[in-house]
UniProtKB/Swiss-Prot annotation:
Residues 81-92, 167-192, 248-278 are extracellular. This is Aquaporin-1. It is a multi-pass membrane protein. The keyword Membrane applies. Induction: Expression is high at the spore resting stage and further increases about 1.5-fold during spore swelling, up to 90 minutes after induction of germination, followed by a 6.5-fold decrease before and during polar growth. Water channel required to facilitate the transport of water across membranes. Contributes to water uptake of spores during the early stages of spore germination. Aquaporins AQP1 and AQP2 act as extracellular pH sensors and enable the spores to hydrate under favorable conditions and to commence germination. Wounded vegetables and fruit present acidic pH, so the optimal pH range for germination is adapted to the relevant host pH. It comes from the Eukaryota. CDD domains: MIP. Gene3D superfamilies: Glycerol uptake facilitator protein (1.20.1080.10). Changing H275A: Affects pH sensing. One of its GO terms (molecular function) is glycerol channel activity. Residues 1-24 are annotated as: Disordered.
Length: 306
């Protein structure tokens, strides 16, 4: 009798457990079904061409935006370390490596979606010489400019107390207490405009050479590490000639943060100092990018996919 009772109890427990598992499974499937039904219903409302258009436009726009936010936030952050007199990190070497690493992280984040241009000079050069669709140029450049502005704004939120501690709440563009250089690029006082223009043109030309060579199909060992090679190239260019211009090589990297400083308290004189130097990092890198790709033409490297 005891054995029979035990067997009945075991069978009943097994049946209850099976029933509970079945109920939990049904509940889970019901929840998943409702979620996926909503998702699929929304997805079905877009036909294939619409989804493709959305992915081709908005995903690339967001990738360029986020990548440029990261690039500018980190690059200007390294500049802040130099400006705010954090002595253990105060050197051009630190700033140069910071620029390279910032670009590398931006490439890692957005490269698989948009190609990680992160730079209007790159986008324009690719459009003219390497078959990048002209219809995408406005979207890319807009994303880059907005991303640069947003990156500067985010950095300001983070380091604003340190800036106040350094300048006493007075926003200086020039002088020992200048903090505008955290965001925009400004050459040393002893450097002429001509030298700064030459530095930006040559630096951007070399940057485009590095991008095109490392991305060429015949350079397989380099293509797999293209982001790292570009970052190393930027670091090297900065160490060699970057100090003469403040080192921009990127119109978005300078214009976005400079515009932010104009709004955030430094005033629109940030566009006028050094005889309207703001025009140099705005246009010289674009010319430099074109020069860089023109130098590649004799070597038939223009088959690189932008």
């Amino acid at each position: 009798m005891a054995s029979t009772h035990s067997s009945l109890t075991t069978v009943q427990n097994n049946a209850n457990n099976k029933s509970n598992r079945t109920l939990n499974t049904e509940r889970r499937l019901s929840m998943e079904s409702s979620v996926f039904t909503l998702y699929n219903k929304a997805a079905d409302e877009l036909d294939t061409s619409q989804r493709s258009a959305f992915q081709a436009c908005h995903r690339e726009f967001l990738a360029e935006f986020i990548g440029t936010v990261i690039l500018v936030l980190l690059t200007c952050g390294f500049c802040a370390e130099q400006t705010l007199h954090i002595e253990e990190s105060k050197s051009w070497l630190t700033s140069s490596f910071g620029s390279g690493l910032s670009v590398l992280i931006g490439i890692c984040v957005s490269g698989h979606v948009s190609g990680a241009h992160l730079n209007p000079a790159v986008t324009i050069a690719f459009c003219i010489f390497s078959g990048f669709p002209i219809r995408k140029v406005p979207s890319y450049i807009t994303a880059q400019l907005l991303g640069a502005f947003a990156g500067a704004a985010l950095l300001y939120i983070i380091i604003e107390p340190a800036i106040v501690q350094f300048d006493g709440g007075q926003r200086y563009i020039l002088g020992e207490k200048s903090t505008a250089g955290i965001f925009g690029t400004y050459p040393p006082l002893y450097v002429g405009i001509g030298s700064a223009i030459a530095s930006e043109i040559m630096g951007t030309a070399m940057l485009l050479l590095v991008i095109m060579v490392t991305g060429h199909p015949n350079n397989l060992p380099y293509k797999s590490a293209q982001g790292a090679m570009i970052a190393l190239g930027i670091t090297t260019i900065s160490l060699c000639i970057g100090y003469t211009s403040g080192f921009s090589l990127n119109p978005a990297r300078d214009f976005g943060p400079r515009l932010f400083t104009a709004i955030a308290g430094w005033g629109f004189d940030v566009f006028k100092v050094y005889h309207y130097y703001a025009l140099v990092p705005m246009f010289a890198p674009i010319l430099g990018g074109l020069v860089g790709l023109m130098l590649m033409m004799p070597f038939s490297f223009l088959s690189v996919r932008a």
